[in-house]
């Protein structure tokens, strides 16, 4: 007589019977109702209304682009916005060409360009400090609903700005003012202070395949 494997004793057979459409529909509805209950509860608990601090960091493409997308949304809601760029030094980009036609936007290109191009730490630090003076003016202006501090994180990486001073200024801003900070290698203290942090990971990048920066995609 053939012996049964001990693990096969009393093991129920998996059902292979197809689920009819009505049963599948009912199960889906039950799952979605449970999910809706959880989400509705979270929405009800999120009652605070104040300005938020967003940080877009990571090695992937799109940190600044995402911030400008939020700015478009803010303008659609009748808000006023300002942009201070800490590293970029180009004024011929597509985003500037587009947003310069919006009277609700103030835009300041205050960087000296990539550090490997300038090769002058004192000059880069002075530019960052001037940019922060402009940013601080907006942080004290309740008329600005959204402030984008583009590539600010590099000022901490290279020691151009004092992180504690920046965090104190951010904390003292008008209560309904939103701020978006972009750039790689966001310091942990900034991440801790932020309300929303997105870490954009680079999976692939066209530049590494030998494709040049393309208008409309990179600038």
Regions found by a protein language model. Give the residues of each.
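Short gly/ser/thr-rich secondary-structure transition/capping motifs
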Residues: 36-39, 129-133, 179-182
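Conserved P-loop
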Residues: 52-140
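Residue-level preference for short coil/turn positions at secondary-structure junctions
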Residues: 49-50, 77, 143, 175
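Generic detector of well-ordered alpha-helical packing
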Residues: 86, 151-152
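Short glycine- and Lys/Arg-enriched binding-loop motifs that mark or flank ligand-binding interfaces
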Residues: 47, 56-58, 74, 179, ...
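Extreme N-terminal, non-catalytic leader segments
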Residues: 2-52
């Amino acid at each position: 007589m053939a012996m049964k494997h001990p693990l096969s004793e009393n093991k129920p057979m998996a059902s292979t019977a197809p689920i009819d459409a009505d049963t599948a529909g009912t199960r889906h509805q039950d799952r979605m109702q449970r999910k809706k209950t959880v989400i509705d509860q979270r929405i009800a608990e999120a009652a605070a209304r104040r300005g938020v601090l967003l940080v877009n960091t990571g090695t992937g493409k799109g940190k600044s682009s995402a911030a400008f997308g939020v700015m478009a949304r803010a303008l659609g809601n009748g808000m006023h916005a300002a942009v201070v760029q800490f590293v970029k030094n180009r004024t011929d980009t597509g985003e500037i060409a587009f947003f310069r036609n919006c009277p609700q936007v103030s835009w300041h290109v205050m960087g000296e360009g990539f550090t490997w191009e300038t090769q002058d730490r004192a000059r880069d630090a002075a530019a960052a400090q001037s940019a922060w003076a402009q940013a601080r003016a907006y942080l004290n202006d309740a008329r600005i609903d959204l402030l984008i501090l583009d590539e600010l994180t590099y000022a901490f990486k290279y020691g151009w700005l004092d992180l504690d001073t920046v965090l104190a200024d951010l904390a003292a801003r008008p209560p309904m003012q939103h701020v978006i900070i972009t750039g790689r290698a966001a310091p942990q203290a900034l991440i801790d202070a932020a309300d929303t942090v997105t870490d954009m990971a680079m999976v692939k990048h066209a530049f590494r395949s030998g494709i040049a920066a393309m208008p409309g995609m990179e600038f």
